[in-house]
Amino acid sequence: MDLTLIIDNYDSFVYNIAQIVGELGSYPIVIRNDEISIKGIERIDPDRIIISPGPGTPEKREDIGVSLDVIKYLGKRTPILGVCLGHQAIGYAFGAKIRRARKVFHGKISNIILVNNSPLSLYYGIAKEFKATRYHSLVVDEVHRPLIVDAISAEDNEIMAIHHEEYPIYGVQFHPESVGTSLGYKILYNFLNRV
C-alpha cells in the first residue's frame, strides 16, 4: 500500500492536504508533530512525507516538533514536501534565514513565477507563472546551497519555492491544497507520482 505521512503542525488545512493525497491514490496518515518520533516514522515506513503548514516559526521546537528532525534524518532517502511552515522548516534546516515578510498574507492570491529553468519533476506540466494562495507572515530568505530557489512571488519577490540540490526535498511557501492555487492539485500529483 502506498503511504503518505503528513506531519501536522497544528494547522486547520492539514485535512485538505490529506483529502487530496487520498484522491490521488495514496493512503494519508496524519500525525501531530509532537506525537511521533523518528523511530515511529521509520516503523511506519512511508513512501513520502508532507510537512504541513501551521502557526509559529521553524526556529522554535515547540512550534514544529519533529519536523526539523524529519528533514535532517529522513530527507536523504524519503521524499519530503514542506508546505508553508514546512517550507520554512526546510529552509531553516539548511541554513536559510527566516524573517518577517514584507507584507502579511492571509488568504491572498499571488502570481508565482518559476525561476529555476532546470526540469524539476515537482513542476512537470506547470506553467512558468500561476496563481497561488498565500497564508503567512514569515518567509525564507538568504537561501544558499544545498538549497535552490525554484519560484518567487511576482509582486514582492519573496521566495515561494525551494528544493535540495541532491535529495528529494521540496518546499512551497504557498498552499497547493487551496482552491485558489490554480495548479496546486497538479503539484501534489507530481509529488506523489513523479518525485
Curated annotation (Swiss-Prot):
Signal sequence residues: none
Binding site for L-glutamine: G54, P55, G56, Q88, S137, L138
Annotated Glutamine amidotransferase type-1 domain residues: 3-195
Assembly and oligomerization: Heterotetramer consisting of two non-identical subunits: a beta subunit (TrpG) and a large alpha subunit (TrpE).
Annotated PANTHER family: MULTIFUNCTIONAL TRYPTOPHAN BIOSYNTHESIS PROTEIN (PTHR43418:SF4), MULTIFUNCTIONAL TRYPTOPHAN BIOSYNTHESIS PROTEIN-RELATED (PTHR43418)
Job description of the protein: Part of a heterotetrameric complex that catalyzes the two-step biosynthesis of anthranilate, an intermediate in the biosynthesis of L-tryptophan. In the first step, the glutamine-binding beta subunit (TrpG) of anthranilate synthase (AS) provides the glutamine amidotransferase activity which generates ammonia as a substrate that, along with chorismate, is used in the second step, catalyzed by the large alpha subunit of AS (TrpE) to produce anthranilate. In the absence of TrpG, TrpE can synthesize anthranilate directly from chorismate and high concentrations of ammonia.
Full protein name: Anthranilate synthase component 2
Species of the source: Saccharolobus solfataricus (strain ATCC 35092 / DSM 1617 / JCM 11322 / P2) (Sulfolobus solfataricus)
Gene name in the database record: trpG
